[in-house]
Amino acid sequence: MTKTATAIRFATIPDKNIMKRFLTYFLVSVTGLALLGMLGLGGIYIWATKDLPGFTRITDYRPPLVTTVYARDNSILGYFYREKRFLARLDEMPQHLPLAFLAAEDDSFYRHEGIDFRAILRAFMKNMQAGTIRQGGSTITQQVIKRLLLTSERSYERKIKEAILAYRLERYLSKDEILTIYLNQIYLGAGAYGVEAAARSYFGKHVGELSIAESALLAGLPQAPSKYNPLNNPQDAYTRQLYVLHRMLQLGWITPSQYDAAINEKLVFTSMADPSWGTGAWYLEEVRRRLIDYLSEDNMEKLGIKLERYGEDAVYESGLHVYTAMDPKHQKYAEQSLRDGLVASTKRRGWRGPVEHLESKEAREAFLRDNPVDAAAMQHEGWIKVLVTRVTAAGADVRFGSYKGRMDVETMHWCRTPDPTVVTDYVPAVKDARTVVKAGDVVWAQFMLPDAGKSFDAASVTPDTDFSLAIAQYPEVQGALVSIEPQTGDVVALVGGYSFADSQYNRAVQAKRQPGSAFKPIVYSTALDNGYTPASTVLDAPFVYTDDATAKTWRPENFSGEFYGPTLLRTALVKSRNLCTIRIAQDIGIPAIVERAKALGLEGPFPFDLSVSLGSVAVSPLNLTEAYTAFAHEGLRAQHRMITGIKSAWDEPIATFEPQQTEALTPQNAYIMASLMKEVVRDGTGF
C-alpha cells in the first residue's frame, strides 16, 4: 500500500529539475527565434535599402509643367506640354478638395508616419484570400514615393522599399508639402495631371472654384481614372463620388447639409477652352521653334544661364511663361484678310470642278454618314463639303450630314471655265447651274446667314431646316502676311498660309521668294543718296543687256509692255516702271544697292547683276517687312521681335528681349521714301 501511494505521488508531481530545464530550453528557443527574426528583418532591411534612390526628385519637386504662351494683351495664345499639368499650391485650393482626396485615399494621413499598418494588414489579408496582390494599402506618402522614385510593379519587394522610403520622406518634408506634391502629380484621366488641370478639363474652371461635389468626383478618380471618368462612364463616376462624399460625412469633414447639397448638385461637364492652334497658329508654331533654339544647352551656356531642362524638354516640361508681341486683334484680321484674298484669287481663275463625283447610291449615303456637320460652322459662315442631289438652271439642292440646303445660281457667277488668255472681267457670268455641277458632285460650300447681324440659334436647327449656301472653291495658291510695328519691331501678326490644319509650313518665315517690285524702294532709296531727287528725270525706253560671259541677251519690259520716254523718278516709283529702275541701278551701281539692302537687314545672297534691281534676290516675307520698318521710322530699322520675355514657372525672369534698332537710312531719305510710297497707294500700282 505504501509503495503504491509513493509511486503515484512521484507520477503526479514532476521533478523540479525537469521543469527548470524545460523553461530554460523554452526561453532560449524563444530568444533564439526572436534574434533570428530580428536578424532576418535586419537582413531584409539592409537588402531593401542597399539600392534605394535619393529624395532629390521629391524634395526639389520639379514636375513636368505646361508652358503657357501669352499674347501682347496677356491673353493666352497657347500651351506646350507633354503632360497637361498646372502647378497649384495648397492655399490656392478650397479646403474641401484635399479633404476629399484624403477621405478617398488616406484618411489617417495626418496621423501616421508614412505607413498605415492597419491598412497594410487589411490589404495583406485580402491579398492572401485572393492568392495574388489585389490591394496595396498605400498611404499618400507611399503613392508619392511610387510615382516619383519607384516603378508601379506589384511585388512585396517594391512594397518594402516603398514603406521604408515613405517613413524616411516624412522626416524630410512636412505633411502639407507631401500632400501638395501628390495633388499636383496624380493622373486624373482625360489627359489631366494634377488637380488644376483636372478642374480645367472636367469643369472648365480653376481649382479654387471647385465645389464639394466637384472635388469629390475628382477625388474618386485616382483609383481608376478610365473607369471613373465621368465623360465616358457617368454612372460609375457618380457611384464613386457618392462613396467619397459618404466618407467625408463619416469623418466629420462635411456637415449633413453640405452632404445633401453635394449629392443633389447637378454637375456640368465642360472643358476650359484651349486656344492653341486656333487663331495665331503659325505665330505659336514659330514661337515654339525659336524657344527650342534659344533654350538649347549650348546657347544657355554661352549666355551664362543655368536651367534644369534645355531645348525641347525646357519648352514642353518647364512650365515657362512666354510673352509675345502678337496682337490678337491684328492677328485675327490678318488671317481673315489673307484667306479672303486667296479665295478671291481662286475665284478670279475660274471653276476647277467638283472635289469628287459619287455615282452610286451607296457611295452618296456613305458620304453623308461619314461627314457630320458642326453647328459652329453654320453659325460662323464656315465651309463644308456638300453633296449635290438635284440641279436646275436656277440652282442646286444639296445634302450635308442629316441636313439639306440650296445653292442658287447667283452664287455661281464666278464659276467660269478657266481661260488664262481672257481677262476675267470680260468673261460672261454663269447663268445656268447645270453648267457648273451635276447630281453626285461633292463641292465646297459656305453657309450664308439669312439676315446680316442676326444671331444664329444652333438649337433651333432641325433636319427640315433649309440652308442657303454659296458654292466655294478651296484655294490652290498659297500666301503669307506679316505685320510689324516699326517703332519696336514687334511682329503683331504673322500668317503662314491659308490653313494651318492643312499645312504647317510657315511661308511667312520659311519660304523665300523673289520680292519683285517690292525691292524697288531699296533701289530708289539708294538713288536718293547718289545724286537723284524725286524730280530727277529718267528715260523709260527699250533696254537691251548682253552678258559678255554667256553672250545671252536680256530685254526687260514694263508690265504694260509700253514705253513712256522721259519720266520723273517719283512717277517711275509710283507706277513701278521696270525700265526706269534698271537705268537707275545701272547708273548708281549694283554694289551700292546691295550695300543698302544689307543695311536694311536683307539676308541675300544677292546676285550682282542688274536683275537684282527688279527683285531677283530671294527673301522671306518677314525679312522684307523688317527692312521696310526703316522707311516708316525715320531711317531706323527695327529688328523684328516675336518673343518679348521668358519667365520660369515660379515667375523668375529667364530672358527679356528689348527692342533693337539700327540706323539704316538718314531721316531725310526715310521721309522722302515714305512720302513716295504713300503715293504708290494713292495713285500708283498699290491703288
Placement of each model-derived feature along the sequence:
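Short active-site loop at a secondary-structure junction
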Residues: 86-91, 423-434, 474-479, 502-522, ...
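Non-catalytic, structured segments within soluble enzyme domains
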Residues: 42, 132-401, 584, 595-599, ...
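Active-site SXXK
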Residues: 101-102, 248, 334, 488-489, ...
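Short, well-structured active-site flanking segments
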Residues: 110-120, 193-196, 255-259, 458-464, ...
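A penicillin-recognizing enzyme superfamily signal
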Residues: 324, 328-340, 344, 363-369, ...
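Mid-domain, small-residue-enriched loop/turn segments at the edges of structured enzyme/sensor domains
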Residues: 551-556, 589-626, 639-642
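N-terminal type II signal-anchor transmembrane helix
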Residues: 5, 9-70, 108, 128, ...
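Conserved catalytic neighborhood of penicillin-recognizing serine enzymes
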Residues: 129-154, 208, 272-283, 487, ...
